[in-house]
Curated annotation (Swiss-Prot):
Residues 131-141 have a biased composition (Low complexity). It comes from Dictyostelium discoideum (Social amoeba). This is Putative uncharacterized protein DDB_G0292776. The lineage of its organism: Eukaryota, Amoebozoa, Evosea, Eumycetozoa, Dictyostelia. Residues 126-151 are annotated as: Disordered.
Amino acid sequence: MNKINNNNNNIHKLIKSLKIGNNDRINNNNNIINNNNIINNNNNDLLIEDDYFNGLLSTSPLPSQFNQLSSSPPSINSSLESIPMSPIRIQSNNVCPGAPIKPKKYLLPKSNYNLPRQRLVFTECVGSGSGSDSSSGSTSSPNTVNNYNSDDESNAAVVSFSPKVSKKLSQSSVQFIPSSSFRQMDSPSGNQNVPVFNSPKARKRLVF
C-alpha cells in the first residue's frame, strides 16, 4: 500500500514538474515571439528609411515610394541591365578594327538633378594595323586595348589626355586626337558616324 502511495506521489510530482516545464517553455516561446515582433518592427522601420533614400535618389521620385516595403533591395545585375546602351557605345567596336574592345557598363551615384549617370569609359587602342610608326619604322597591330574607368563625381568632368588636349564633356561622344601625327581619317564602310583614326600611333576615344 505504501509503495502504491509513493508511486502515486511520484507520478503527481512528475506531472507537476512537467506542467511547470511546459509553462516555462510556453513563457519562453512567448518571449521569443515578442522579441521577433520587436525585431520585425525595427526591420520595417529600416525598410521605410531605405525606401525614403531610394526615393530621393530615384530618377522620378514618387511619394508612394516612401511607404512601400520591399523584402529585398534590387540586385546589382538588374540595376546594370536597366542602363541602356547608347548607339555610340554599341558601335565602339568599329573605332579600332581588329582590337578586342569589350563595351562595359558601370554605375555611378545619381546626380543632384535626379539623372542617372554612368561611369566614364576610356578606350585606348594602340596601333591600327596599317602604316608604319614614324619612330620605329615598324607596323603595329591593334592588339592592345586598355579601359580606364574614371570615378570623377562632378557633373561635368574635365578630361586631359595631354597638355594640348583638354575638353569639357558636353556631348554624348567626344573624339580626342592626342597627337598631330595622324595623317588620315577614314570611316568604316557602312558607318559614317564613327570615325577611325588610321594611324599606327595610339588613338584615344572617350565614350560615356
